[in-house]
Every structure is written in C-alpha cells, then in structure tokens.
C-alpha cells in the first residue's frame, strides 16, 4: 500500500491556504487602527483603549448567529456573495436591540469540501457589510468536514462584539401602556423561515429556483436570497438625534408574535394592527401556495417588518423625521395593559 495523505482523507490544506490568499486583502480592508493582528494569527488582538475613552461605563455586548438553510438557496443558484451580508446583518441586529454599536466580527465557514472561490465569494459579502457599518472582520475559521455535511452545502456562523454605555442600554423596562410600536420594513425573509419556505416553494409548489412567478419581481431563488437588512445606521440615526427608544426587537425566527414579547416588561402586551404596513408579495405567495394559516405565517416569518421600535407617542414624528430618506416607518401597533404577548387585530 502506498503512502496516503490528509487530502486523500478529504481535507485539502492547500485549498485552505489558497482561500486565505483570496480573501486576505478584502478582510484587511475592514481593519481599523484598533486591529493589531493580521490574518494567520492564533487569535485576534483589538486595542480597546481608544474605544473605552468614548465611554464612562462601557459594557461589552456579544451575540452569535447563523444564516440557517438560506445557504441551500445560495448553493442551488451558485450565488454565494450575499449570504456573508446576511451573516453580519443577523448578528449585528441582535446587539443593536440593546443599543450597542458593533465593532468586531468573527466568522466560521464549514463545508464538506473546501472550494476557495466559494469561500472568497462568501467572505466578500461579509467584507461589504462590515465596511458599510464600520465593523472589523478580525478573524475566521474554515472547516472542511467530509462525511459531516452534504456535498456542496455550507454552514455559516458569525460572532459579533459591540459596546454600549451602561446608562444607555436599551432594556425595555421603561415600556408602558400607550407607547407606540413602529415597524421598519424588511426586504424579504432575511435569514429565518427558510426550511418552511423551501417546503412551500419546492415541495408543495414544485418550483425551481430559476422559475418566475407573476407576483414576484425576481425569480424564486433571487427573491429568497434577498440579503438581510442591517439596521445599524437606522438605530444610531435615531439615537444620535437623542430620541428615546424604549425597546427594540429584531424580528427573526418566531416573527412579530414571538420576538416583541422578549423586550416587554411584565404587565405589558402589544396589539398589532393588521394592514398597517405593506406585506411583501413573497409572503402572500407562500401563504397561497402552502395554504398556510395567518397565525402560522406571523409566527414563522417577519411578514415585511424587520425591526420594531417602541417609543412614546410624542416621539413618533421625530423617528419618522430622523429616518426620512433612509427607511419608511410604519405605526403598526400599541402597547396595552395585560399579558406579555402579541395579539393581531
């Protein structure tokens, strides 16, 4: 028997090195002067002193997230340049809920067989998203795992770190009945509900990713691949105008029904007014194809609202004014006395 090597077992070290060569310039372009290490280090060094000088009592906020089975849509289309945007946006939005400014990002890309060009495409999306919001992509990991992942599939995970002034942490504790619920529009499914959406379109509907449906402007695949909106600029535009946001909810898995209660204090519920914002065509199409009940749609998908602000009724106009030209703002409901839950009316 001749000599064997690692590559014959399914792991190609040279491919990993090639991937690093392809992404290194893009990754470095996200670095600020706070980043003290380059690619290839065992860890990432980030100088906190210049950051901490801007805070009286800094609190670090971290979150970890993935993009779920949206990667399957990317694989079917052979288009991987937006799922990196999804990864950064999903993680960043989760810490924005507390008023934290995202600073650094780490990524993990796993697959059955490492293809450097695909890794480059995925990371290019992260780089784009990081540069748009001032986040440094300080490190990452690629894992080639034969026999673990199906051929051609990828798993993406991102870890984000941010900072917030302790006195300015948005906790939701000051929310009270009479406050107004504002919705910021999504542009699609974002990164949640893809197993359900794939079942509806591909199993029940019998569609292919390249098929066109009259009510959708793009093909099924491109509609589903629409990148997750990053709300960093939205949140800080409002906060920098010294408008008091009492609570923020990132509308992810569980939709409005499951996510808004996560930021409500005891004794407060929310009534959502159906029809108070435009539901995107993709959701209406899925509901029709799958004959899905309304409540299930609102629990599985964001239904066209990607982030929710809860504010005093007197601040509604100020929020709309601050975000004019950046996003539409819809008054979608109100805070009421009662159980910590969301009701649709």
Annotate each language-model stretch with its function.
Residues 2-8, 25, 118, 122-136, ...:
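Glycine-/charge-enriched secondary-structure boundary and capping motifs
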Residues 2-34:
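N-terminal amphipathic/basic leader segments beginning at the initiator methionine
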Residues 31-187:
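Glycine-rich phosphate/pyrophosphate-binding loop regions near the starts of catalytic domains
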Residues 177-218, 222:
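Acidic, glycine-rich loop-and-beta core segments that form the ion-binding/anion-interacting portion
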Residues 43, 162-164, 186-190, 198-201, ...:
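Glycine-rich beta-alpha junction loops
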């Amino acid at each position: 028997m001749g000599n064997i090597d690692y590559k014959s077992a399914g792991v190609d070290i040279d491919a990993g090195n090639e991937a690093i060569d392809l992404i290194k310039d893009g990754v470095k372009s996200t670095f600020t002067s706070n980043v003290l290490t380059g690619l290839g280090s065992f860890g990432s060094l980030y100088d906190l002193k210049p950051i901490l000088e801007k805070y009286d009592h800094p609190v670090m906020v971290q979150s970890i997230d993935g993009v779920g089975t949206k990667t399957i849509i990317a694989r079917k289309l052979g288009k991987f340049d937006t799922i990196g945007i999804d990864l950064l946006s999903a993680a960043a939005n989760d810490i924005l809920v507390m008023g934290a400014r995202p600073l650094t990002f780490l990524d993990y890309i796993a697959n059955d067989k490492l293809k450097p060009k695909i890794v480059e495409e995925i990371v290019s999306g992260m780089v784009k998203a990081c540069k748009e919001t001032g986040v440094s992509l300080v490190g990452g990991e690629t894992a080639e795992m034969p026999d673990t992942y199906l051929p051609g599939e990828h798993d993406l995970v991102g870890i984000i770190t941010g900072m917030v002034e302790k006195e300015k942490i948005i906790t939701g504790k000051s929310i009270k009945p009479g406050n107004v619920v504002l919705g910021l529009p999504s542009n699609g499914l974002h990164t949640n509900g893809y197993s359900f959406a794939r079942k509806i379109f591909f199993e029940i509907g019998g569609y292919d990713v390249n098929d066109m449906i009259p009510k959708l402007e793009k093909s099924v695949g491109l509609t589903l691949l629409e990148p997750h909106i990053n709300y960093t600029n939205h949140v800080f535009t409002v906060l920098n105008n010294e408008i008091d946001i009492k609570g923020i909810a990132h509308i992810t898995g569980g939709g409005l029904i499951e996510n808004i209660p996560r930021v409500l204090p005891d004794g407060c519920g929310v009534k959502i007014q159906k029809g108070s914002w435009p539901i995107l065509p993709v959701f209406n199409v899925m509901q029709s194809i799958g004959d899905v009940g309304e409540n299930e749609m609102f629990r599985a998908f964001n239904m066209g609202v990607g982030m929710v602000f809860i504010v005093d009724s007197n601040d509604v106009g100020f929020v709309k004014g601050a975000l004019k030209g950046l996003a539409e703002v819809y008054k979608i409901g109100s805070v009421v006395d009662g159980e910590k839950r969301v009701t649709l009316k």
